[in-house]
C-alpha cells in the first residue's frame, strides 16, 4: 500500500478500516499518530500499531 497523509477525520476513517472490530486508540492530543500519519505519510502497518 502507498504511504498516505491522513489528518483529522480521514485518519479516523482509515483507522476504522484497518482495525475493524478490534477498535483503536485515537487521542489527537497525543503526538504519535498525527506526527506519523498527518505531518508525514504513513503506511497501513503503522496504522495497525494503533489498533487495540
UniProtKB/Swiss-Prot annotation:
One of its GO terms (biological process) is glucose metabolic process. GO terms for cellular component: extracellular space. Disulfide bonds join 7-38, 19-51, 37-42. PROSITE patterns: INSULIN. Its main location: secreted. Keywords: Carbohydrate metabolism, Disulfide bond, Glucose metabolism, Hormone, Secreted. SUPFAM superfamilies: Insulin-like (SSF56994). It is found in: Secreted. GO terms for molecular function: hormone activity. InterPro entries: Insulin, Insulin-like, Insulin-like_sf, Insulin_CS, Insulin_family. Insulin decreases blood glucose concentration. It increases cell permeability to monosaccharides, amino acids and fatty acids. It accelerates glycolysis, the pentose phosphate cycle, and glycogen synthesis in liver. Belongs to the insulin family. Heterodimer of a B chain and an A chain linked by two disulfide bonds. This is Insulin. The gene is ins.
